UniProtKB/Swiss-Prot annotation:
BP GO terms, sorted: cold acclimation; response to abscisic acid; response to water deprivation
Lineage of producing organism: Eukaryota, Viridiplantae, Streptophyta, Embryophyta, Tracheophyta
Segments for region (5 X approximate tandem repeats): 105-199
Family named by the database record: Belongs to the plant dehydrin family.
Induction, per UniProt: By abscisic acid (ABA) and water stress.
Keywords associated with the record: Repeat, Stress response
UniProt GO cellular component terms: cytosol
Coiled coil: none
Name by which UniProt lists this protein: Dehydrin DHN4
Amino acid sequence: MEYQGQQHGRVDEYGNPVAGHGVGTGMGTHGGVGTGAAAGGHYQPMRDEHQTGRGILHRSGSSSSSSSEDDGMGGRRKKGIKEKIKEKLPGGHGDQQHNAGTYGYGQQGTGMAGTGGTYGQQGHTGMTGMGATDGTYGQQGHTGMAGTGAHGTAATGGTYGQQGHTGMTGTGMHGTGGTYGQQGHTGMTGTGMHGTGGTYGQHGTDTGEKKGIMDKIKEKLPGQH
């Protein structure tokens, strides 16, 4: 097939020759005359934005700076979730761990013993399990029948650590019964009047048959014989 046409000797910006689009007529092999645009082969370098070998990807928008970073090859790669989290943490460090809830506060209930009273009262083997409750400052009721601690009942009554161990009473009236740690062990003893009767830890152990309470008080008072 004959080809006639004009070719413009132009070059592109890189100096490569660019064939022009000429209009020519060609004589077909079978005598037909045809007209058409000359197929001047354009040569253009591959300058698409998606170039093989470089992988250039142009992005628009403000979020690209925070969600991607340069991969060193002219492109950008997606940041991982851990890297994003590290950037959002104060100072950009993600290796600071805050252990929450490691210092819990627990309360332990130990039963009904010593519930009603104040300052650590203990009731050990009373029938109700609430021995020496109304007394103050650490009274202990061990084996009394009641041990519930209304003033003047078993293992109560006295203040500042009075202890009633086995008898049904062992205390006496309110505010009596050996202030500051008097202990009544078996019977009706361990009582005494207010401010007397075994101050600072006197022990009343027997059944009250050896000496009367008033005799004991007189012996303890200064100047009394």
